[in-house]
Design a protein with these regions (language model features):
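Adenosine-phosphate binding glycine-rich loop
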Residues: 25, 32-34, 46, 198-250
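Well-ordered, non-membrane alpha-helical segments in soluble/globular domains
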Residues: 55-71, 108-111, 138-142
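Glycine-rich phosphate/diphosphate-binding loop of Rossmann-like nucleotide-binding domains
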Residues: 117-181
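Electropositive, gly/pro-rich neighborhoods at or near active sites that engage anionic ligands
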Residues: 45-65, 73-92
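Short, well-ordered secondary-structure micro-motifs within conserved domains or adaptor modules
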Residues: 1, 15-23, 176-208
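Gly/Ser/Thr-rich loops at beta-strand to alpha-helix junctions
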Residues: 79-86, 100-105, 130-137, 157-161
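A glycine-rich, Thr/Ser-enriched phosphate-binding loop motif common to dinucleotide/cofactor-binding enzymes
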Residues: 95-113
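N-terminal basic/disordered segments at the start of proteins
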Residues: 1-39
Length: 250
């Protein structure tokens, strides 16, 4: 029988999102304005900085900006990739956008991009999927990869055997046991599994994508915002589909 995927957290309801930007300008007070980023309504707080500004003052201004966003109803924020003051934002109740659901949803394109970069044909490739349980994204990735690659390895305690048996029955797939043939790519949906080949860690606040970078197929992203949290937000609120994404390999 078809194994049921384990519980999977549903992305939270989309709320007003903030942008915290350190901007070189005169003044001391953060300024809040409303804007749209790729169709998303956002509140941007401009935090004034200048060359030579002491670190403690910059952090204090970032805290003031975060507090202003929180009072306006913002709970999650986007920033530049190298934004230095996340602890100050978190101290005022803001948090980053969780990239895990998005990264796990695009596990298959990421795996295929890793194979292309390595020059490995799909029909000769072995891909491993690991995690602490058979989650919905892991199950979906396994079912999609079966017809596309030579071998799958399902490295999940307990539930993995049931999933492997179902894949063999449903697709006639060659599903190998963990610890055997070395995979070319490992898709890790959580900690604890064996990591061999090119390892894509699709979990946690900072997923490890082994130099692969999702980008928009058409049009660019704002250069002043970290791309992965923004793409995760667009995907979460239904403004982004897999067909609009291209995986750039570095």
């Amino acid at each position: 029988h078809k194994p049921g995927p384990g519980a999977y957290p549903v992305p939270e309801v989309m709320g007003l999102v903030g942008i915290v930007a350190l901007e070189e300008r005169r003044g001391r007070r953060p300024v809040v304005t409303e804007e749209r980023v790729l169709g998303l309504r956002c509140l941007r707080v401009s935090v004034p900085v200048r060359p030579g500004l002491r670190e403690d003052r910059r952090k204090r201004r970032a805290e003031q900006g975060a507090a202003a966003l929180y009072r306006a109803g913002v709970r999650r924020a986007l920033t530049a990739e190298d934004f230095p003051d996340w602890p100050a934002l978190e101290g005022q109740g803001l948090r980053s956008v969780d990239p895990e659901p998005f990264c796990q949803a695009i596990a298959v394109p990421l795996a295929l991009a890793a194979l292309r970069r390595a020059g490995i044909l799909r029909v000769r490739a072995t891909v491993a999927l690991s995690g602490p349980r058979v989650s919905r994204p892991l199950f979906a990735a396994a079912a999609r990869l079966c017809p596309q690659v030579r071998h799958l390895v399902v490295d999940v305690p307990g539930e993995g055997e049931e999933l492997a048996a179902w894949l063999r029955e449903e697709y006639g797939a060659a599903v190998l046991r963990p610890g055997g043939a070395a995979p070319d790519v490992t898709l890790a949906f959580g900690p604890g599994g064996e990591e061999r080949g090119t390892v894509l860690r699709l979990y946690g606040p900072v997923p490890g994508l082994a130099g692969l970078r999702p980008i928009l197929e058409e049009g660019g992203l704002p250069p002043d915002l970290a791309p992965l949290p923004l793409l995760s937000l667009l995907w979460e609120c239904g403004r982004l589909t897999e067909g609009q994404i291209r995986i750039h390999a570095t």
